[in-house]
UniProtKB/Swiss-Prot annotation:
It comes from the Eukaryota. Exhibits Kunitz trypsin protease inhibitor activity. One of its GO terms (molecular function) is serine-type endopeptidase inhibitor activity. Keywords: Protease inhibitor, Serine protease inhibitor. This is Kunitz-type trypsin inhibitor 1. InterPro entries: Prot_inh_Kunz-lg. Belongs to the protease inhibitor I3 (leguminous Kunitz-type inhibitor) family.
Amino acid sequence: DTDSDLVLDVDGNPLEVGSEYYIGRAVGFYVVERFSSDVQIDSGLCRSDGFWRVSLDAYSPPTTTSSQQQRYLTVFRDRLSGLKLVGLTDDSDRVVL
């Protein structure tokens, strides 16, 4: 459903605007806005790729000035364990959520 703010993360858990999202044992990030989403349904699995903005503070999202870079959630494969992990990137071409 492209009108929904619901998407599943790499573990199959719902990621929603207004929810808190953790990266390992790090401080939680709050999903504050979805910029765009491309929903694909393949073999019964729903995948949504798009741009999301996250904040350390749910009530006052960060503003981006010309001296600051936008940060995005991305998925990468850990070299030691081979597991897919979630991380932050400032490269908009590497956004995978």
